[in-house]
Amino acid sequence: MNITSPLSAPSHQYPDALGRFGNYGGKYVPETLMPALTELEEAYYRYRAESSFQEELAGLLKDYVGRSSPLYFAERLSAHYARPDGTYPLIYLKREDLNHTGAHKINNALGQVLLAKRMGKKRIIAETGAGQHGVATATVCARFGLECIIYMGVQDMERQKLNVFRMNLLGARVQPVTAGTGTLKDATSEAIRDWVTNVETTHYILGSVAGPHPYPMMVRDFHRVIGQETRQQALKKWGGLPDILLACVGGGSNAMGLFYDFIDEPAVRLIGIEAAGESIVSGKHAATLTMGKPGVLHGAMSYLLQDKEGQVTEAHSISAGLDYPGVGPEHSYLKDAGRAEYYSVTDQEAITALQRLSQLEGIIPALETAHAFAYLETLCPQLKNGERIVINCSGRGDKDVQTVAKYLQMEI
């Protein structure tokens, strides 16, 4: 069940020629970056249409990443939500955690490094929060022999020591970012500064469906294989489509990868789950689509967490990968269009969900992913018997063991 043409044209034609998803997206960048973005856009359109690019990408996704990832029926987790009359919804996991490097991030990193190689770029930079995108980027750079610099906030480096070591082991240089809050927003800002300075030799592998055009489109397209496989696997397993797709949302790449091929299927609910952090009322959260307002960050118009003066505020989440005050512009568009729903869950709810999945299914999810599982507590009681939910199990939780132990006040 391998996808042989992961970048074929969809019927949902966004972004437009200006890189906009309705009112969102675009290119809000310094003039020095415009030629690089134009070069990247032209190269992407050119190479994605070439059969040799398609074949190389499909071959690596199969033999290097290990695709297709399974669609797994979580029997005990489903039964956990049984009602007194014995009825319950059916929960399936799209197992992106089983990919090489342990998350969905490798899909995009691999696609972009093939693009960079064809563009003649010898130096690769990236930002990372949870470290999974950094590890994926370091991995593909090792595979293709390219110089790799990863920008990572010092707070995230402390939370994700295991992934920092993995990146170093893979030959990347991890550049600590002390500015601001020392988290993903600041790492992204530093990576953009580097790119402005070294634009001739360097390709920036942005890790989410955020940033200026063409990144939201390009990253979505490289992750689209998730939804394409899900459709094929669902049709094979039960002869229909899922009733609900559920995914966590930080920048929003794993969710867009799952959602995109179902946007034109109105019977399929699309639900994204953000980080409510300590709580929404505390102000310490990363619930951008729930609580934010439109504004510009990192080159694109989208929903942002802002204060009354329009300044971007700090985000908070126990999960480094959701700790971001913005979101991809296509998610903002889907929210306003009413096509996707967005809710939030707290740190505590995510930790509890991580424990629940671990103990019921023997699968330890990433803290980011656990936010989606936490929403089952709210969602499942509302559903009819036999309704099918597909959750994007976007990453494994090895990287989060220390964070979880610290939160639970347990010694390792």
UniProtKB/Swiss-Prot annotation:
Family: Belongs to the TrpB family.
SUPFAM superfamilies: Tryptophan synthase beta subunit-like PLP-dependent enzymes
Keywords from the named record: Amino-acid biosynthesis, Aromatic amino acid biosynthesis, Lyase, Pyridoxal phosphate, Tryptophan biosynthesis
Species per Swiss-Prot/TrEMBL record: Synechocystis sp. (strain ATCC 27184 / PCC 6803 / Kazusa)
Biological or metabolic pathway of the protein: Amino-acid biosynthesis; L-tryptophan biosynthesis; L-tryptophan from chorismate: step 5/5
GO molecular function, one term: tryptophan synthase activity
Modified residues (N6-(pyridoxal phosphate)lysine): 105
PROSITE patterns reported for this sequence: TRP_SYNTHASE_BETA
Top-level taxonomy: Bacteria, Bacillati, Cyanobacteriota, Cyanophyceae, Synechococcales
Record's subunit section: Tetramer of two alpha and two beta chains.
Full protein name: Tryptophan synthase beta chain
GO biological process: L-tryptophan biosynthetic process
